[in-house]
Amino acid sequence: GQALPGGAFADIDAAIGRPAAGAGSDGPDRLAAALQEGRSVTVLVSVDLLRSPEARATLQQLNNLLHVLRLLGKGPAMQFLFDRANQMGAWDMGGLPAALPGLRPVADDAARATLARNWGAEIPSEPGAGLDAMLELCVGGRMGALYIVGTDPLVAYPDRDFATRALGAADLLIVQDAFLTDTAGMAEVVLPAAGYGEESGTFTNNEGRIQNVRKFREPVFEARGNLAIVDFVAALRNQALRPSTQAEIFDEIARLVPAYQGLTQDGLGADGAFTKAVPTLPAGMLPAPPPVPTAADRLMLITGDCLFHNGYLSERSDILNTVANDPYVAMSAQDTAELGLSDGDQVIVRSGQGELTAQLKVDRRFPKGLVFVPENYRALRLNSLLRRGEYPCAVEVQKAHATPEVDRPGRIWRGV
């Protein structure tokens, strides 16, 4: 075994921000005691952490905590509670600008050499551009062509005004999507892609379980499978991509991505199969925006999904919209009482960027000082209230004097 450092328990206190001895029993004290007594520990990381300016620093603290717990023999694990389907799979495939497939840093010489041998191409050692950097390049007139696949930055990016200006400044905007999204409406070229059930593949959920997605119908009208579209675009550049079939790509993943090694698509079965545990995500793979000062006396707007309903797919379903079809604003009972608001009131949420109107929900479990508006209702244009790099966002809330007409999801274009 490995000798346990004498200060390991003190390290736990430091990692969780425990106050000095004698400060009294509170949340951090109880957490430290539970971590010391528990046989195993799983840390669940919410998506709000990844959105915050403190994401990198907090993730580094969590990495330190997991290291101490590992020395204590706790067998710790960390799981991100992603709010997008297959986000874990996208990260595993190298979807982060500073990561290679398998969540290995781009500076890893051995990992780059392995990929270079298999792909017959040089792998850059410097991180690529994330979405923030890409949009900045657009605004600066340095983006010749921007190719967007399966996402809608005009709705998802936390600053609609900036995203609109940036996308409009690109010399050429190409969108590949199954739906005519707001972003596709700005594009010079739209490549209609297959939707769910129109092509085969796999996805990896939050717990690392990889499952099959099977094709059960052909793409409608002129739409093509995403692989076929990528092959078509490559051919326009006189390039041939290999492998180019879904089965061949899975075999390559199982060969080159450590967490997937040894898996076969036939062996996934009806319930899927777990990928192998990988080292904790290095904090350096996340962006480090400057901290945003917050005023203690201001209401702060946060956002997220309502249930498992982020709107990109689910808002296009009449059936799913019967479960959560009305946008709302959630606040604490204390804040609403101070503002003279009641449950069910139509309220205006206003920031320095814009405003929206929705029905108020008073939640007695909600902490004072926070306002929550789910992001999955496209008609609200919630991101019109947000400014890039500023999250949470300071807002004011007041009662609306008239009930506005808010588009219901049933009147939103659903694509093909």
Region spans (language model):
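Extended redox/cofactor-interaction regions of prokaryotic respiratory oxidoreductases
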Residues: G1-A33, T58-M186, P192-E207, F216, ...
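Long, contiguous, secondary-structure-rich segments that constitute the structural scaffold
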Residues: G24-D26, R214-G272, S314-A330, Q334-V416
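Flexible, glycine/charged-enriched surface loops at secondary-structure junctions
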Residues: T42, L72-L81, L241-E248
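Short glycine-rich or small-residue beta-strand-to-loop segments that form or flank ligand, phosphate
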Residues: T42-S52, L62, V149
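Flexible glycine/proline-enriched surface loops and loop-helix/loop-strand junctions
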Residues: L44-S46, R209-E218
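Short strand-coil-strand connectors
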Residues: L137, G144, Q211, R350-G354
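Catalytic alpha/beta core of large soluble enzyme barrels
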Residues: L191-P192, E375
